[in-house]
Amino acid sequence: MMGKEEEIARIARRLDKMVTKKSAEGAMDLLRELKAMPVTLHLLQSTRVGMSVNALRKQSSDEEVVTLAKSLIKSWKKLLDASDAKARERRRGGSLPTSSSKEASEAQDPSRKRPELPRMPSTPRITTFPPVPVTCDAVRTKCREMLTAALQTDHDHVAIGADCECLAGQIEECIFRDVGNTDMKYKNRVRSRLSNLKDAKNPGLRRKVLCGAITPQQIAVMTSEEMASDELKEIRKAMTKEAIREHQMARTGGTQTDLFTCGKCRKKNCTYTQVQTRSSDEPMTTFVVCNECGNRWKFC
């Protein structure tokens, strides 16, 4: 008979296939199975079923599927929130269960005393981060709250099992240590992290930060270019190549003319070069440089 973990993992794999094939046929039955199961945080983390359900929710156009998927994610988020609350209580030195009654009974009856075994955590985390120093600074506290909200975008933290509050505190602490104060440089640094972590077109960055592939120390000092999505990096790379090519073409000579009017300075002192940039049966591309202000443009 299949165990609970294997059963949930099987459902997760089937949901992943549906997302890949862009077909939600049978999804409701699988989601109902999950709804009927007593899922723990440990099972969520070990099977990553939360990510599978969330991916289906984002892709599906079936209202019933979306509604049930949202309901599951909401109920699982409560498990994570409860675990986070316990972790915060431990970090703040909250009251721990007293063992005085147990010690008293053992003192009365020494035979009942048994050697204690090391306790295993009931809800192990996949992604853990060291404790973050507490701050009383209002600006820093607000920045930590905003970073926490950014990390919680799209519920990826539920599936990964990350403590967003602790992670946000680590990121803010690294930014503060690098900058040294909460002036404009600090605020701009935090602002750029927020926009990139919340970017719907760049979920990969947020997931890498949540699972620890990108550390708080790294995300705290990364440039906008380094945080950009792979797609945007490719676009920037292509644009840089194109700009270099145009610059090189303009420097290799050309024909001076007064046939073109510069859109920037409105003068007609220009140099143009015609290059076959596409197939031989396509029109040539004309590159124009204004000799007065240096403005460059092209047309076919």
From Swiss-Prot:
Zn(2+) binds at C262, C265, C290, C293. It is found in: Nucleus. Pfam families: Med26 (PF08711), TFIIS_M (PF07500), Zn_ribbon_TFIIS (PF01096). Residues 84-131 are annotated as: Disordered. It comes from the Eukaryota. GO terms for molecular function: DNA binding; zinc ion binding. The keyword Phosphoprotein applies. Residues 139-255 form the TFIIS central domain. Keywords: DNA-binding, Isopeptide bond, Metal-binding, Nucleus, Phosphoprotein, Transcription, Transcription regulation, Ubl conjugation, Zinc, Zinc-finger. Residues 6-83 form the TFIIS N-terminal domain. Residues 103-117 have a biased composition (Basic and acidic residues). One of its GO terms (cellular component) is nucleus. The modification Phosphoserine is found at S60, S101. There is a cross-link at K58 (Glycyl lysine isopeptide (Lys-Gly) (interchain with G-Cter in ubiquitin)). A zinc finger (TFIIS-type) spans 258-298. GO terms for biological process: regulation of transcription by RNA polymerase II; transcription elongation by RNA polymerase II. CDD domains: TFIIS_I, Zn-ribbon_TFIIS. The keyword rRNA-binding does not apply. Its main location: nucleus. Necessary for efficient RNA polymerase II transcription elongation past template-encoded arresting sites. The arresting sites in DNA have the property of trapping a certain fraction of elongating RNA polymerases that pass through, resulting in locked ternary complexes. Cleavage of the nascent transcript by S-II allows the resumption of elongation from the new 3'-terminus. Belongs to the TFS-II family. Interacts with the basal transcription factor GTF2B. Interacts with REXO1. This is Transcription elongation factor A protein 2. It comes from Bos taurus.
